[in-house]
C-alpha cells in the first residue's frame, strides 16, 4: 500500500483516523483527497521505524503523533520542563537535534524554528505545539482550540456542562470541584471514539482541527 501511494499519513489511533478522514472531505483538502493516500496506523513507539522505507521511496509523508509529556504536571512551567515519553519524537530528536530526551520547551522551539518539522524533504513530524494550548494529546488539543483555553486552565462543572450541551459533545466531567482539559480527557479515556463521533456528528471536525494537524 505504501509503495504505490502518492502520500502517506501515519497516525496513532482510531480517533486520529476518524478526524482525518472527516476533514479530508472538506473543499480545503480537495487536492489531497484526489491523490492516493495511504493511511497507516502506528503506535507512538513505532512511527520512527518507517523512516528508512519512506526515505528510500521518497514519498511525502506525515507522522501525526502525541507529545505525551508527564500527565501529572499541573502548571505551564512544569509542562515546559517535562520530557516527552513518545519514542518516535525522541528518536527523531536524537537524530536531528542531538537530544534523545528533549523537554517540551526544546520541542516547542524545534517546531518554531522549522515550522513545520520536515526531515529529508519527505517526512513531516507533527505533534502538539504551544499554540495547541499546551495539550499532550489529540483530544486535549481539540478541546483547547474549541474553548480557547489551555489544557491546564480550570473551569467549574456548570461551565463544562454548558459547553457539552451547546456543542453536543460527549465527554466525561469529573464530579469534584473545578476541572481542566487534562482531567476531562483522562476521565473520557475509555470513550474517546464516542467523543470523536460526537465531534463529527455535530459538524465540528474542521472547527476543532488542531493546528499541528492542519499545518
Model feature map: region roles:
Residues 1-10, 14-215:
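Acidic, Mg2+-coordinating catalytic modules of nucleic-acid enzymes
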Amino acid at each position: 500500500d505504501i509503495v504505490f501511494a502518492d502520500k502517506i499519513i501515519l497516525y496513532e489511533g482510531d480517533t486520529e483516523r476518524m478526524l482525518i478522514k472527516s476533514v479530508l472531505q472538506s473543499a480545503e483538502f480537495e487536492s489531497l483527497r484526489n491523490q492516493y493516500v495511504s493511511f497507516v496506523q502506528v503506535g507512538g513507539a513505532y512511527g520512527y521505524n518507517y523512516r528508512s522505507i519512506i526515505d528510500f521511496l521518497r514519498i511525502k509523508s506525515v507522522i501525526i503523533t502525541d507529545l505525551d509529556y508527564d500527565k501529572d504536571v499541573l502548571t505551564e512551567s512544569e509542562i515546559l520542563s517535562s520530557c516527552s515519553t513518545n519514542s518516535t519524537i525522541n528518536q527523531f530528536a536524537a537524530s536531528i537535534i542531538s537530544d534523545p530526551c528533549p523537554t517540551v520547551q526544546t520541542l516547542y522551539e524545534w517546531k518554531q524554528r522549522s515550522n513545520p518539522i520536515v526531515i529529508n524533504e519527505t517526512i513531516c513530524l507533527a505533534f502538539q505545539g504551544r499554540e495547541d494550548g499546551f495539550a499532550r494529546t489529540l483530544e486535549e488539543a481539540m478541546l483547547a482550540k474549541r474553548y480557547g483555553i489551555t489544557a491546564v486552565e480550570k473551569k467549574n462543572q456548570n461551565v463544562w456542562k454548558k459547553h457539552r450541551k451547546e456543542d453536543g459533545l460527549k465527554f466525561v466531567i469529573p464530579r469534584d470541584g473545578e476541572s481542566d482539559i487534562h482531567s476531562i480527557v483522562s476521565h473520557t479515556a475509555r470513550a474517546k471514539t464516542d467523543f470523536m463521533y460526537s465531534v463529527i456528528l455535530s459538524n465540528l471536525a474542521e472547527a476543532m482541527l488542531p493546528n499541528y494537524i492542519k499545518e
